[in-house]
Amino acid sequence: MADGRSIVVFHPTSYRDSRPIGERFRDGDVVLCDLSWLEPDEAHRLVDFVAGLVFGLGGNIYKVTAHVLVLAPPGVTVLDDAEHLTGSFYNQS
């Protein structure tokens, strides 16, 4: 991204993988999380974690598919011209 931010893709396999996700989001990067490798209870815990993270830092979460989330930090707008995004299920604005 032009302003020095990155788009970082994570494929977590357990809740233990939440820390680097949080660190990259906290640093202002856009984070794409593919939760398809997680067991349902682990996925639920991770979604709870990122929801709190995004709320605390004023960003947005977008559900791209049933298992893929985009975490957008403040100041980043996610657009989808094909209307595949089911919408922001947490919008701080």
Kindly label every feature range from the protein language model.
Residues 39:
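Acidic, metal-coordinating catalytic cores used for nucleic-acid/nucleotide bond scission
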Residues 1-31, 36, 51-93:
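Positively charged, small/polar-rich N-terminal and surface patches that mediate targeting and assembly
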